[in-house]
Structures are given as structure tokens and as C-alpha cells.
Curated annotation (Swiss-Prot):
The lineage of its organism: Bacteria, Pseudomonadati, Pseudomonadota, Gammaproteobacteria, Enterobacterales. One of its GO terms (biological process) is purine nucleobase catabolic process. Pathway: Nitrogen metabolism; (S)-allantoin degradation. This is Ureidoglycolate lyase. One of its GO terms (molecular function) is ureidoglycolate hydrolase activity. It comes from Salmonella typhimurium (strain LT2 / SGSC1412 / ATCC 700720).
Length: 160
């Protein structure tokens, strides 16, 4: 099956998470007016006994064509990825309770100046780079195991 890749924007991505970007976002000045602060762009969630982690993930480019055969989710916390050097990247997401609802399966490509924050329990493809090795600033939870993985029928990404 083919899965069309759409441009990433907050309106079409909102059911799955937050788009982390400055475009069309409110800001205020700090540090004597030298800094524009784009405040509270994503909601980070962890359970009370867990803690928030900041990491860097170095992702390798996926082999082309990109074939999707599994999704994962994190029921105990959100997970954010922000490319550190302006690289575009692809995210693949779906809603669903115990298993991914394939009628909600979507793929998005960022513009290189956007990151994503997946809501808790949102099914998504494991992180990968698109065209080049990419470092991602990653914000997620530390604690016990927090990853459910489900196989799905194979889908091939189709770039419009």
C-alpha cells in the first residue's frame, strides 16, 4: 500500500502531537530585548515517579524506498524530536488504543525548522533520518520500560 507524505503543520498534525516551530507563533522579548522567547510550544508529560530526559539521538538515513511495517507508542510519556542542523525529516503516525488504527495512518515531512512532540499513546514509526545522518535533540521520559511495538501491513511512502 502507498502512504502519501504531507507537509507538516500544526493543524493537520494536532491529533498526534505538537509541531515545535516558530512560524506563526506568539513570542515575547527577554534579556533586554535581545531574545524572542517562543514559550510553551509543546506539552511534556511524564508520570510523577519518572523524570524528563534531554538526549541527542544520531539517526541514520532510511533505505529508499521507505517501507513501514511496524509502529511503536509510549503510554507513559510524550516524546519530542527536534533536528539540530536544519534537516528535514519524515514522521509516520497513527491513532488507536491497543493497536494502531490504520485508517488514521499519516506521514508528514518537516521543513527542517520544525520538530515534533508526540502525545502519549500516539503510534509512530521509530525515528529515522531522511536523506542524511541527523542529530535530534530528544525530550522524553526516564524510568521503566515505555515502548509498545506492533507490526502492521507493509506501506511504502509516496512523496507527492
Amino acid at each position: 500500500m502507498k502512504l502519501e507524505v504531507l507537509p507538516l503543520d500544526q493543524k493537520t498534525f494536532s491529533a498526534y502531537g505538537d509541531v515545535i516551530e516558530t512560524q506563526e507563533r506568539e513570542f515575547f522579548h527577554i534579556n533586554n530585548g535581545l531574545v524572542e522567547r517562543y514559550h510553551d510550544l509543546a506539552k511534556v508529560e511524564v508520570l510523577e515517579q519518572d523524570r524528563t530526559l534531554i538526549s541527542i539521538n544520531r539517526a541514520q538515513p532510511a533505505a529508499m524506498p521507505i517501507v513501514v511495517h511496524e509502529l511503536e507508542r509510549h503510554p507513559l510519556g510524550t516524546q519530542a524530536f527536534v533536528p539540530m542542523n536544519g534537516e528535514a525529516f519524515v514522521v509516520i503516525v497513527a491513532l488507536g488504543d491497543d493497536k494502531p488504527d490504520l485508517s488514521t495512518l499519516r506521514a508528514f515531512i518537516s521543513n527542517g525548522r520544525q520538530g515534533v512532540n508526540y502525545h502519549r499513546n500516539v503510534w509512530h514509526h521509530p525515528l529515522f533520518a531522511w536523506q542524511t545522518v541527523t542529530d535530534f535533540l530528544t525530550v522524553d521520559r526516564g524510568g521503566s520500560d515505555n515502548c509498545d511495538v506492533e507490526s502492521i501491513p507493509t506501506h511504502e511512502l509516496c512523496f507527492a
